[in-house]
Every structure is written in structure tokens, then in C-alpha cells.
Amino acid sequence: VVVTLDGRGNRWSTAVWAGDERGLRRLASVPPPNSLGYFYAAVTAYLGFAPFGGEGRLMALAAYGDDDPEIESRLRSVVDAGVDYDVTGLVGEGIPSAVSRLEALFGRGPSRPAAPSDRWAANLAHVTQALLEETVVAIVETYCDRQGVRTVCLAGGVALNCKLNKQVAESAA
């Protein structure tokens, strides 16, 4: 199974493929703006980092955070995680609108750029990372199970997230 995960991609923000000696066959696809890359970029921008370039900082900040039920509940009110994810409620009108939506949702803007000492920002990064992992692992597990395989190849900008890769590797084992 090959899963491409991107902000926009050439045509799809997420696509799932089955591969064999004859080539690749598309199993599922999700068009932008329903994009995990846009979701992660929106939170990246909200926390004061450059979207489509500063996502590694968000991933690093997540390591300093903890689960926060309040943050998770609010984020899940605009983001549906899982195999049939839908993030258009947050990012459907673009990153600047998504940042405004996050400011309204949380009633605050964190320090710019966010630092590990900002517990709230670190917790938001942690919850964001967890939702991304939950969604991608669900996609991988669902399509690997359907194809009867345990091997997966991730591609695209979202797949550069090393913490995500660790979770996918552990789930596929």
C-alpha cells in the first residue's frame, strides 16, 4: 500500500494506492482543501511558525506537550479524525481563515512564535500531532487490512513527519 499525504499535491491531498508488479492502482483519494497538510500548516501558522516550512517546529514542540481534553474537544469540533477524515471545517477557506478560526475557537493567540515554555501551545501542538497520527494510522491500517498486506510506503510532505512515521511503523508491525 502506498499512501501519499500532502498539502495539495498534484491532484489529491491524500491518495491511497495498491501496488504490484503491474504498477499502482488508486484505491481512494481526497481532494484539497480537505487536507491533513493544510490542517497541520494551519496550526503551525497559529503558533507563530511559517506554514509550509515550519511544520518541523510544530512537531518538535509537540514533544513538550501533554494530552489536554479541553484543547482536544475544541479541535475535534472542527476536525474529524480517522480514515474518513474531514478538516474542511477548519481549513476549507485557506490558512489565514483557519488561523482566525483557531483564534476564535480558543479565544487566544499564543506567544509568537510559541516556545516549549508555553504549556498551552505545547499542549495544542501535542494534540495536533496526536490527531494527525490517529488519522494516518487509521488510513494505513484500514487499507493494509483490505489489501491483506503489512507493508506501506508513505510519500508527500506530511510523510516527512518522523513522529508520524514511528507511529505508522509500530502499527504496521
Which role does the model predict for each range below?
Residues V1-A173:
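Short acidic/glycine-rich loops and adjacent helix/strand connectors
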